[in-house]
Amino acid sequence: MSKLNMTPREIVAYLDEYIIEQKEAKKFIAIALRNRYRRLQLEKSLQEEITPKNILMIGSTGVGKTEIARRMAKIMKLPFVKVEASKYTEVGFVGRDVESMVRDLVNNSVLLVENEHKERLKDKIEEAVVEKIAKKLLPPLPSGVSEEKKQEYANSLLKMQQRIAQGELDSREIEIEVRKKSIEIDSNVPPEILRVQENLIKVFHKEQDKVKKTLSVKEAKEALKAEISDTLLDGEAIKMEGLKRAESSGVIFIDEIDKIAVSSKEGSRQDPSKEGVQRDLLPIVEGSVVNTKYGSIKTEHILFIAAGAFHLSKPSDLIPELQGRFPLRVELENLTEEIMYMILTQTKTSIIKQYQALLKVEGVEIAFEDDAIKELAKLSYNANQKSEDIGARRLHTTIEKVLEDISFEAEDYSGQSVTITKELVQSKLGDLVADENLVKYIL
């Protein structure tokens, strides 16, 4: 299932498989994303008038803010980028400018479209790769041979291609010409500098420059796949589609927005650069034109989802103009002991299932008693209460601590089944959680 026209109910049902509770936040996101689909069904003139209602999510770290947005963008194949507001600086200061988040979104969008085109041409690309390798392995026919010899050669070439495709010749070595590795371009610089970089690369590093390399057939397949993909793909069409998709259905998730809010408690110690970042962010969220290396993009139809814990500040500490650009607000609930237990047992790819799969690679079967899972949830919740509340992320730390000896000595347990009991969890974590200092430094 990966479609843009999922109904809000279907969206929430999908999110329920991965994220426990937070029903209100899921509902807000589902409606916002469904409205993207609804807008695209309207007449062009009306489409221009309808802008997305941006969302402000308020909640502690680890309660599912990012995961809700990320999962949604993934299933609906929307261009998505997550940024942290605290990483940006006001124009004129050293650091990243806010426009770079839009450039990152466009980069991700073009890559998303490119991968879709590659997937559609997958069979054609693989056929071309196999044919090229087969012709390298099979010496060419001399000119002037009989029709019978030509037919024999064609049959041999076909058999060779079948063997290459099935991986029978993966270990054979072959000498092929491959393109020189392209020079990486820093996409976080302004478009003017990007163009200078690209022009310099064209002068000093020609696209057609190739080098001969001896590779295994398996390695040659990968090297040629990238080269043939570039030949078959329409780069210009991909760029245009990527730009269009970022503009009409892109999602920018701005985390830690509370870090650029100027708390009224700070009084005379207000940080002018924080307010400066907010003012730089305002035109992007309101709707402006940003230049990227692929072309210009209008930001007025991009959906912005901002998130923050707001422990030291309040949403009202943001400048009024920016507050007005996030009309939908939703507060995410803190994780209780019961929710922690549900995260471990009811999510589709729970942490427990992940660790079981990892250790199964070593031939170790791990089983968790229900009491052990309840104890893990309880101790993780207690650790959050005694130290920094990091939500569900605490579960990763506690399970890692319980399983560290088994993970380290996995070869000794190969072919065995290991049951994690409540007593084992208590012996590994009980003393640590009881001691506040140890909780802060170890868990």
Curated annotation (Swiss-Prot):
Q: Which HAMAP family is this protein grouped with? A: HslU (MF_00249)
Q: Does the keyword Chaperone apply?
A: yes
| GO molecular-function term, one example from the UniProt record | proteasome-activating activity
Its domain of life reads Bacteria
A Pfam family that the UniProt record links to this protein: ClpB_D2-small
Task: Read off the CDD domains from this record.
Answer: RecA-like_HslU
> What organism does the UniProt record list as the source?
Helicobacter pylori (strain J99 / ATCC 700824) (Campylobacter pylori J99)
| This protein's record includes keyword Lipid biosynthesis | no
What is the protein's name according to its record? Answer: ATP-dependent protease ATPase subunit HslU
Residues that coordinate or bind ATP: 20, 62-67, 255, 321, 393
Which keywords does this Swiss-Prot/TrEMBL entry list? ATP-binding, Chaperone, Cytoplasm, Nucleotide-binding
Q: Quote the subunit structure annotation.
A: A double ring-shaped homohexamer of HslV is capped on each side by a ring-shaped HslU homohexamer. The assembly of the HslU/HslV complex is dependent on binding of ATP.
Q: What is its main location?
A: cytoplasm
